[in-house]
Amino acid sequence: MSKMRFFALQELANRRPVKVDYPSEKLADYYGNHVFDRKKMQEYLPSEAYKAVINAIEKGTPINREMADMIANGMKNWAKTFNVTHYTHWFQPLTDGTAEKHDGFIEFGEDGEVIERFSGKLLIQQEPDASSFPNGGIRNTFEARGYTAWDVSSPAFIVDSTLCIPTIFISYTGEALDYKTPLLKALGAVDKAATEVCRMFDPNVKRVFANLGWEQEYFLVDTALYNARPDLCLTGRTLMGHSSAKDQQLDDHYFGSIPPRVTSFMKELELECHKLGIPVKTRHNEVAPNQFELAPIFEDVNLANDHNQLVMDLMKRIASKHNFTVLLHEKPFKGVNGSGKHNNWSLCTDTGINLFSPAKTAEGNMLFLTFIVNVLMMVYKNQDLLRASIVSAGNSHRLGANEAPPAILSIFLGRHLSHMLDEVVARLNDAELTPDEKKALQLGIGRIPAILQDNTDRNRTSPFAFTGNRFEFRAAGSSANCAASMIVINAAMAHQLNEFKTQIDKLVNGGMEQEEALYKVLKETIIASQNIRFEGDGYSEEWKAEAARRGLTNICHVPEAILKFNDEQSRAVLIGEKIFNENELFCRIEVELEKFTKKVQIESRVLGDLAINHIVPTAVIYQNRLLENLRGLKEIFSTEEYEELTEDRKNLVREIQNRILAIKKAVHNMTEARKVANHLGSQVEKAFSYEEQVRPYLEEIRDHIDHLELEIDDEIWPLPKYRELLFTK
């Protein structure tokens, strides 16, 4: 294995940037070329079929079979101009990845001749085997049938020689087995609820759209070094490895010059993204060595999520052409920053108003304040649900590690906006406002744009931060499907807005003016949610104590956090807003618990194998060298000199032996704990046992191995070290 390490380093020394041939035309000329967008639809579809698609996208109007056949034929004819041979229903099962089954256009015609055909039936619905995808026990293995159904709101696209059609994925009995189905329901719920609130201010608002701008962080590691690390290959993270003498302490990597090989990779990735209509805009070095970030322009949440899933797949494919491997694990390297996926979320009306952006009028700013205050209450009431949406085996290593937001949910507004809310509360008393008081309040609210223009600070330690015209949810992990958190945020916001509107309607029906009712409910909501507002250092120990005093939860136990999907408030949101039914919610919880269990199980098995079959034998080899050295020294020195000169080596032999014994004992105990956990009856019991009884051994074993790495001759150490993984370009 040590030979593999040094062969990898030799191979890496000869790496050169891969040349990327950029098109000679302007970006606008090839942007979206591989997407069946509205422009292509107009060109390849009959006018009645084009209108049917647009009505389906904008109004949800069903597409009949005749129109579906026209659309499918036009889609196929467009795809054939790119020499496409196959099509697939592209969907997002509960695996944090995408799935596809490729079928050819080939069919037999009536006369037995081979033809190429793509029908509306094949476009709209397919039947992939659902038995091998995560389903949380709501389907038996022998009940294999599942359906994929075309999501008309997300355009088809071409990857390699395959036409990819975004779809939802449901069971034979109609239960959602994917991320897209509940995401579309959550977006529909927030659209309806937000529109109702907006129409209190502007009756012209017909729809509200949720937008998302994700920021994808990742590491790049040379493929030769990656292949020499079985833990990276099998778990996505290093289960052992002592920190490098230099890591990120000089802050010299963040926004630094991008290495040439990485630039070539980024160029090709951007090129392929632009062909697929993915509006990637920003690229830069991140904080940790060999860590980078990619970010696009904001889009509709559903499309943005599809694009993020596609980007993660593209990154892996393109990286291999540049002799890199992309690491999307949240914490691939101990001691340096992990990777997240910041979700920048906003709500916009069909009249062009960003509901999280201050307006130019007092009335517009009342709308702004209304939505800001409802976000505060949404997060306050649903802390546990938001945490459940982002917690995982990988992300638990990152959250609260002085590099990422803590497991405590809070909102950062900036002190000026926070002060403005306090001022609103102070001005609103229980008595009816006089005209002068209303005018003073409106003048104060009218100053919001001027106040925020230069005073919207940033707080990188906040998990949910207002950043001027959006909220940035920073707790999501880099490998996660954005839909997991977007489902929860939009569903919870819909639930909160519905409750807010119900409170106002009740007061109005009781005889109160709508404006007075709005002021009253706003004041009550600001006061009720004030504990969720925090402007300080989210990494500090003081904040943990303060959060506890405020009644904010801090759950670091992964299975316990997952089970919060099923508490009373979470059920009120997820089932109450019809995002999930009982079976679907049970399925999500079981799938997340099983995912966690299996990931820890795999890590445990891999570490046990590496410890016993790679590290311990290496330690014994070095120990034998030391013993041979001691025997040689004993032959040439007197007893007194020998004792004096060899004390350090004898201590080292003893140290190595003690660590070997400790590793073997810990691996044995970990294996026994795993056996016990595997025989427990329920998925909840298994997950709790893996968290509490198995997982602690990973750190214990690692600690011994990392000490041995510093003590054993570098020449025989079998695995690439952190200095090689993080600093070789």
Which residues does each PLM region occupy?
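Hydrophobic/aromatic-rich, well-ordered segments within soluble, folded domains that form packed cores
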Residues: K80, V84, T88-F91, H307-S320, ...
